[in-house]
Amino acid sequence: MLSDQAYDPPPEAGERRVHSALVRPRPLTPNRRLSPFHMTPFALPIDYPRIRRVDSFSALVSTPLTDGVNALCWERALAGDYAEVVAALGAGDGEPLMALDAARLRSLSVSAAGRVAIEQMLADWQLLRDHSLDPVLNCIYGYPRDEEAGPVVTDVFSFHADSAPFEASTYLCTYHGPSSEGLRNEEARRRVDLPATRAELLRHYGGADDADFAVYLNEHCYDLHYAPAPGAKPFSFGLGNFWRIATDYPDSPVPPCVHRAPDTQPGDPPRLLLIS
């Protein structure tokens, strides 16, 4: 898990993560002015039953992930100028990620619209904290890529599922910059199940395709990463939308939600991301 003190691969990297209890609703900041990034219309995938819309934070945290539903989306058009917040944060001193807290954000010299954006992000962060979750709010300038991936790339740009040892969900919201992307389970193939990839993994492992090999795949998180099927159409999580997605945990009633960090390019704006 990321902390304010050190940079590790973000939770979107598919690491085995532990989450705590649920969260309760809190009023949002009144609507004022939209950031330019929030002017782009957002549409959930049509006729995809695994995603369910909710209309409040209380519904986001209390609606069960069952009957095939593995993602909840609270669509929101947020007020505030998030681009101004990113500009005020600066270039990040060459680091790929800047951890944000109330003191740092409230010390920024921004307009009233920038202040609205700051208070919105902190309000969302507090919603999660109020329910004993461990959210992190970051300005992300770039993700490190897996330069020595071997047969399976395990960086944040690979489609993957989050994992936990017990029932848990991942909560996330992108406020600025490219947003997270999802992949329909029906269009996802576990990379370890692709014959050529599995054969190469077995060569790296140097043993038989048995229970010990399954442990090897699990320990390296290879079993959490997915390849899009031919013709797959990933979908955007959009900006300002608050998501709750299913993780891979023992006896889960639904498959995990497959997702990834956006494949950012040079010149793309930094991301403001809340995740728990």
Predicted regions and their residues:
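Short helix/loop capping segments that flank catalytic or ligand/cofactor-binding pockets
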Residues: 83, 182-184, 253-254
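Short, surface-exposed beta-edge/turn micro-motifs
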Residues: 68-71, 168-171, 240, 270-271
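Catalytic core of non-heme Fe(II) oxygenases with the double-stranded beta-helix
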Residues: 153-232, 238
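Catalytic core of Fe(II)/2-oxoglutarate
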Residues: 219-276
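Extracellular-facing segments of soluble proteins and assemblies that are Gly/Ser/Thr-biased and enriched
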Residues: 109-164
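N-terminal amphipathic/basic-hydrophobic helices that include classical n-h-c signal peptides
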Residues: 1-38
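N-terminal auxiliary "cap/dimerization" subdomain that precedes the catalytic jelly-roll/cupin core
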Residues: 16, 30-132
